């Protein structure tokens, strides 16, 4: 149902930004509406880093946890995320990192549908705004952590 994307040019090293996105256990420190996170499994399989992680997302009376399958392709500089369970009918996230001089162009695409049709309608109306807030949070975190790199 909702599908959106954002693209940002961030004045940080590509590898540091990838490390930031893969640090799922740190998300509650800076991602809006992320209340908790946990990495259950992390395996380096050569060209692929594979993780299984939970995120608890909430605002107001709404709160839910979903489990994700996260795969980082080192050769392509792409992170793909799919849901395994939780309130989502499906979730497909795609992060792409491209070096641009001393900066990195980060593309973040999200496509998802909630199992609850009412919540799905509510989310559709504010989805791009929420995605922009998440992208802002990653950019601000990168600027804070890697300012002098």
Regions found by a protein language model. Name each.
Residues 114-149:
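A conserved amphipathic terminal alpha-helix motif
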Residues 1-48, 102:
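Hydrophobic ligand-binding cavity/cleft-lining segments
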Residues 23-26, 62, 102, 123, ...:
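Amphipathic alpha-helical protein-protein interaction surfaces
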Residues 20-23, 49-53, 75-81:
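Short Pro/Gly-enriched beta-strand edge/turn motifs at strand-loop
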Residues 93, 108-109, 124, 136:
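Compositionally biased, intrinsically disordered linkers/stalks adjacent to structured regions
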Residues 28-29, 36-43, 56-103, 111, ...:
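Hydrophobic-ligand binding "helix-grip"
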């Amino acid at each position: 149902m909702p599908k959106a994307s954002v693209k940002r040019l961030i004045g940080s090293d590509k590898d540091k930004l990838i490390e930031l996105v893969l640090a799922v256990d740190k998300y509650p420190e800076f991602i809006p509406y992320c209340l908790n996170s946990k990495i259950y499994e992390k395996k380096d399989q050569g060209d692929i880093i594979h993780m299984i992680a939970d995120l608890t997302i909430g605002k107001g009376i709404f709160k839910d946890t979903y489990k994700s399958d996260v795969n980082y392709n080192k050769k392509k500089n792409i992170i793909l995320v799919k849901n395994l369970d939780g309130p989502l009918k499906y979730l497909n996230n795609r992060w792409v990192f491209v070096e641009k001089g001393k900066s990195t162009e980060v593309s973040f695409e999200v496509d998802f549908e909630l199992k609850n049709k009412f919540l799905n309608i509510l989310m559709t109306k504010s989805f791009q705004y929420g995605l922009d807030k998440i992208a802002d949070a990653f950019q601000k975190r990168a600027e804070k952590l890697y300012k002098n790199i």
